[in-house]
């Protein structure tokens, strides 16, 4: 295992560092301290490096990136309806950065922080450990929240991402990494990328992408990924009902042993399995690297955001995102690469 550190540049008059984790197979994970960003997850196949995610080549591409490209989201990923919620008898008002709702932790959330970083290394793992304390003055959420995000690469080509947090007052905590995958050979589009999900329901969303509270079966619809299916095939079925994209929350079965989702290429070269200890997966089609193609919905990236179901604070059956005062919590997301 090897860990290197280099200067990535400067944002907001802060020096941003880049950490690269490399195992003996040549698999690399690069992390930027700005936004706790996963800049690279790549593997070596037959002597050629192949990226598994969609990325930007330099720091400038991650400065207020509208896609939150492979960046940390928090304190709460997804949207909070009305930019407010009730907690311990008090109404908490957040900044409505997506009027009239709050989105992805707000304009001063995890994405817009330059995290402190250290590293850890063992015989078969390499880690970068990112820490930050969020205050109510920063993001309007209650409590001073101490958060640690740890990226760990193993010799088995598994990337574990852990989120550890503790607050001095009750608050909300539902973080994720907004990772955009494309595991196909040339990463040009999603025509040859298939997806399989562990669940058979999705949330009904309104026009602002706020959950209505209803869960509906996916069987037989364009949202049915109970068996491996290309993104293109699913989109083609959605088009028949006037839909043009995936920007949806799926109900999945949390598990450390069974993937909540698997992504592969139809040539059979590679797969990535996603594991999570939470019950939601937001799936989003995009093209973060080509605005012209994005305008005509020519997608080359599939965001897979593992989290508790969005807007859970307003829906008791979606899961518990309340973090009581002085109580530690940990969540884990894992990506397992397999050469086929």
UniProtKB/Swiss-Prot annotation:
InterPro entries: Aldose_1-epimerase, Aldose_1/G6P_1-epimerase, Gal_mutarotase_sf_dom, Galactose_mutarotase-like, GH-type_carb-bd
Industrial and biotechnological uses noted in the record: Available as a commercial product from Sigma Aldrich (catalog number M0902).
Gene3D superfamilies membership: 2.70.98.10
Active-site residues per Swiss-Prot or TrEMBL entry: 178, 305
Species of the source: Levilactobacillus brevis (strain ATCC 367 / BCRC 12310 / CIP 105137 / JCM 1170 / LMG 11437 / NCIMB 947 / NCTC 947) (Lactobacillus brevis)
Protein name: Maltose epimerase
GO terms for MF: aldose 1-epimerase activity; carbohydrate binding; maltose epimerase activity
Enzyme Commission code(s) on record: 5.1.3.21
Any Gene Ontology biological process: glucose metabolic process
GO CC term, one of those recorded: cytoplasm
